[in-house]
Curated annotation (Swiss-Prot):
This is Translation initiation factor IF-2. It comes from the Bacteria. GTP binds at residues 472-479, 518-522, 572-575. One of its GO terms (molecular function) is GTP binding. Residues 518-521 are annotated as: G3. Residues 497-501 are annotated as: G2. It comes from Cupriavidus taiwanensis (strain DSM 17343 / BCRC 17206 / CCUG 44338 / CIP 107171 / LMG 19424 / R1). CDD domains: IF2_eIF5B, IF2_mtIF2_II, mtIF2_IVc. The keyword Cell membrane does not apply. Residues 78-87 have a biased composition (Polar residues).
């Protein structure tokens, strides 16, 4: 028996010798080196130790080893629907091995051997039975595979046979057609030749009948040719029909042959396909057969394709698609996916039937034809507003927004779904997509106002008082004249004795009620006077007899003529010694205002607001003009009017002075004035007394509006507050874009001006006034002060007192706050004092304009002026080391000061312009040298001084500029 070393045993066990030595020592076998001899007893001890350490203490247990072998293959088969499936075939082989223990005691050997024989016999029988079953299964699988291969080979052979038969039939038909054509051509040639021979013989034999025979021969030839052509045409039609039938059969065969072959796929590809199938669809539709195509006689839709082909994978591919994008929707509906809009009753539709029908219903649906009748494209009439988003345009055309975006891309414009298109672009897109585009009118809720106004046109018209506007130049006595009429002293209460608001009053005279509007005469209130002329029936033009026609008088005449109202001229201040009414008449005639005594239509009335002379005549002329005009207005109707003035009161809120033009305004009515609306909470007359209603030509002051309306806005009474709010919000949004566009344009213009003209001084201002008319006039007057060097910037303009928000805005913009007839509250004053904000209060408009003009003058760059102070003649030149040229001079005129500017003249030509460096008399430095004295001087950075040169000494002074 060969001896075994520790190293050899370690090599057999595929272990390292060191690890085996450790295990031997742990088992109690004394081996120290790999060269030591190991015996069978040592191996047994090692085995026992290993069994104990691994948890197997019972040696009597027999070991049983089971071997399982698996073989996997794939077979591709087609089911009844034509879909190809992959079938996995797995073959399992199982084998059990039992290891006997030869080291058992001898007295157990016989029993163990007998038991082993019994076990081996049973195991052998079981293994034989299992091998037999596996052999049968393998044989059955091989038979199935062989049958599948034979079926495929048979199909291939049949396909080849059909293809060859088809080709042979085509060749035979072509040869037959060619042969028939040749035979017919030969027959026709033979007939023609025979006819020619006959005619030639007859021409030689019988010359008399040549013409007749030739005609008959020609007729026979024509008939033969027509018959031949007819036969040829019939043959061509038959050949074309046969060719089309053969091509259709060939396409069907080609489509069948292009079905996927039954090949084995790798498991990874099969898993990927299964995963893709789980992700993409739930229903399957078979490929549409060629026979279901539309017939030539049927009407095809515009977007239908011409041909249908299949790719290598058997999927339907459109060849020759139309140029429109609308094919995608039909292709999506034709796919096997569930789509919410598919209500055609097709197989793939979500409305195809109830869910509980089972597999039979699905199989029946799969066998149903997929052909859908073509439909005509729907042409819609799309009304396109001024602006419309892409999503809204798609909704109007009943298409997806992506279709509109694609069409815009085709037109060369990249848009998003929320991008706004202008009307012209949107109409082009609509027409490109096959619909009809119409320019729609803006959905204007103000159209409701016209309808409401028409409902009350049939109201009874009653006489109304005239509205008389008093206009004229400043300080010509308009308000004083009105005071005498009203028997009040309004003029004494105006700041500076000038009118700065529109005052509306109604006066009861002996000749009826007259409503007066007193307008300011200062040049800044142009817009106010224009509004006064717009609301009036008659204009009283007040001209001072001692002053004559002035600029604002001419402007008032222009406003009155623009409004188309008659003018009554009141020549005021006739009680003054220097009054000259005739000169006033001549000046007014030059302005196209001709008095009645000169043949005109304007009555001239000399009056005196101080003594009251001529007032009655003036009122009589006004009444006569009113009678001529026949002023009437409905009384029992919703009120309409005009905003004469508006302001913001700290306690009452927005307040508007309204002149009612028609209807009756009552407390509690819902009014709309521009973008402001609200319910009339309180109504006061011009004396501050509460009133419940106001009829035509009556001025009132109302409270309860949502904001301060713009002066000159039309006032309407609406039936409910909801409609008023809707129209007001519409008006606010309608002009917001225009306002922003103007602001942006102004910013751009300012930026360009600053870039081109350099840095411009800016005076930022915040203007707050008591009424809107004054604020408007003040802002316009201040903006007129802007020049190319200093510009007035109105940061904010508003109505009402100066608040803390105004001070904060002034702090941020470094602006000066101007308060016109308003004051700052305590919080605003404290905040302004803390932040160093300048707040200026004014009561007279030209005081504010003058002070701002003075401030702007201070911001102007000072003007530099040059003044010659003396003249020096160079008598001698000295060269001093380290100093340069020193000129000995005589002051011939004026005085020379140290550090003065100097010009060097040689032959009356300036050769240098610089500054004196030093000035001495003898050896002493002096500050100045007067005329007639000698001095020595040196010029900074100039040494080319020569005898006979003239030095001109001058200085530059800065002079403040004014606007």
């Amino acid at each position: 028996m060969a001896s075994t070393t520790v190293a050899q045993l370690a090599a057999e066990l595929s272990r390292s010798a060191a690890a085996l030595l450790e295990q031997l020592q742990a088992a109690g076998v004394g081996k120290a080196t790999p060269e030591d001899i190991i015996t069978e007893s040592d191996k047994t001890r090692l085995l026992d130790y290993l069994k104990r350490s691994h948890g197997q203490a019972d040696d009597s247990a027999r070991k049983k080893i089971t071997l399982t072998k698996r073989e996997t293959s794939e077979i591709r088969q087609s089911d009844a629907t034509g879909k190809t499936r992959t079938v996995q075939v797995e073959v399992r082989k199982k084998r059990v091995l039992i290891k006997r223990d030869d080291a058992a005691p001898e007295h157990q050997a016989d029993g163990a051997e007998a038991q082993a024989h019994v076990v081996d016999a049973a195991e052998e029988a079981r293994r034989e039975e299992e091998e037999r079953r596996q052999a049968e299964q393998l044989a059955r699988q091989e038979a199935e595979a062989k049958a599948a291969r034979e079926a495929a080979e048979r199909e291939e052979a049949e396909r080849r046979a059909r293809q060859e038969a088809l080709e042979a039939e085509q060749r035979r038909q072509a040869e037959l057609a060619a042969r028939k054509a040749e035979e017919e051509a030969a027959a026709s040639r033979a007939v023609t030749e025979a006819n020619e021979d006959t005619s030639r013989k007859k021409a030689e034999d019988e010359k008399a009948r040549v013409a007749a025979e030739r005609a008959e021969a020609q007729k026979a030839a024509d008939e033969a040719k027509a018959a031949a052509d007819k036969a040829r045409a019939e043959q061509e039609i038959a050949a074309r029909k046969r060719r089309e039938a053969a091509e259709a059969e060939a396409r069907a065969i080609q489509q069948m042959l292009n079905a996927p072959a039954r090949v084995l796929k790798a498991p990874s590809e099969r898993k990927a396909e299964e995963k893709k199938a789980e992700q993409t669809g739930t229903l399957h539709k078979p490929v549409k057969p060629a026979g279901t195509e539309a017939k030539p006689g049927e009407k095809k839709p515009v977007t239908a394709t011409a041909t249908t082909t299949t790719d290598k994978k058997g999927k339907v591919v459109k060849a020759g698609t139309s140029s429109t994008w609308q094919d995608e929707g039909s292709r999506k509906k034709g796919s096997g996916l569930k789509t919410r809009g598919d209500s055609s009753g097709g197989v793939g539709g979500w409305r195809g039937g109830p869910r509980g029908r089972g597999g039979r219903q699905q199989q029946h649906d799969d066998s149903r034809s997929n052909f859908q009748a073509p439909t005509e494209p729907v042409v819609r009439e799309v009304h396109v507003p001024e602006t419309i988003s892409v999503a809204d345009l798609a909704h109007k055309m009943a298409v997806k927004a992506s279709e509109v975006i694609k069409q815009m891309m085709k037109l060369g414009q990249m848009v998003t779904i929320n991008q706004v298109l202008d009307q012209e672009t949107a109409m082009i897109v609509v027409e490109e997509m096959g619909h009809k585009a119409y320019a729609a009118k803006l959905d204007d809720p103000e159209a409701l106002l016209v309808v409401d106004g028409e409902e009350h046109e049939d109201a009874e018209l009653l006489p109304r008082p005239p509205v008389v506007t008093v206009m004229g130049h400043v300080d010509h006595g308009k308000t004083s004249l009105l005071d005498y009429i009203r028997r009040t002293k309004v003029a004494a209460g105006e700041a500076g004795g000038i009118t700065q608001h529109i005052g509306a009053y109604h006066v009861e005279t002996d000749r009826g009620v007259i409503t007066f509007l007193d307008t300011p005469g200062h040049e800044a209130f142009t817009a106010m006077r224009a509004r006064g002329a717009k609301a009036t029936d008659i204009v009283i033009l007040v001209v001072a007899a001692d002053d004559g026609v002035m600029p604002q008088t001419k402007e008032a005449i222009a406003h009155a003529k623009a409004a188309g109202v008659p003018i009554v001229v009141a020549i005021n201040k006739v009680d003054k010694p220097e009054a000259n009414p005739d000169r006033v008449k001549q000046e007014l005639v030059a302005e196209q205002v001709v008095p009645e005594e000169y043949g005109g239509d304007s009555p001239f009335v000399p009056v005196s607001a101080k003594t009251g002379a001529g007032i009655e005549d003036l009122l009589e002329q006004v009444s006569l003009q009113a009678e001529v005009l026949e002023l009437k207005a409905p009384v029992d109707a919703p009120a309409k009017g005009l905003v004469v003035e508006a302001q913001l009161d700290k306690g009452k809120g927005p307040i508007a002075t309204i002149l009612v033009s028609s209807g009756t305004l009552k407390r509690g009515d819902v009014v709309l004035a521009g973008s402001a609306y609200g319910r009339v909470r309180a109504m006061l007359d011009e004396n501050g007394k509460a009133t419940k209603e106001a009829g035509p030509s009556i001025p009132v002051e109302i409270q309860g509006l949502s904001e301060v309306p713009a002066a000159g806005e039309e006032v309407l009474v609406l039936p409910d507050e909801r409609k008023a709010r809707e129209i007001a919000l519409f008006r606010q949004g309608k002009f917001r874009d225009v306002k922003l566009a103007k602001q942006q344009a102004a910013k751009l213009e300012n930026m360009l001006e600053q870039m081109t003209e350099g840095e411009v001084q800016t005076l930022p201002l915040i203007v707050k006034a008591d009424v809107q008319g004054s604020q408007e006039a003040l802002v316009q007057s201040l903006q007129k002060l802007s020049t190319a060097e200093v510009r007035v910037q109105i940061v904010h303009g508003g109505v009402g007192g100066i608040s803390e928000s105004d001070v904060n805005l002034a702090t941020a913009s470094k602006a000066v706050i101007i308060g016109f007839n308003v004051r700052a509250d305590a919080g605003a004053r404290k905040l302004a004092e803390h932040n160093g904000i300048d707040i200026r209060y004014y009561n007279i408009i030209y005081d504010a304009v003058d002070e701002i003009k003075a401030a702007m003058s201070g911001m102007l760059a000072p003007e530099k002026r040059e003044t010659t102070t003396g003249t020096v003649e160079v008598r001698q030149v000295f060269r001093v080391p380290k100093v340069g040229a020193v000129a000995g001079c005589m002051v011939t005129d004026g005085v020379v000061k140290r550090n003065s500017l100097v010009r060097v003249l040689r032959n009356n030509v300036v050769i240098h312009d610089g500054e004196l460096d030093s000035l001495k008399r003898f050896k002493d430095d002096v500050k100045e040298v007067k005329q007639g004295f000698e001095c020595g001087l040196s010029i900074k950075n100039f040494n080319d001084v020569q005898e006979g040169d003239q030095l001109e000494v001058y200085e530059i002074t800065e002079v403040a500029r004014t606007l």
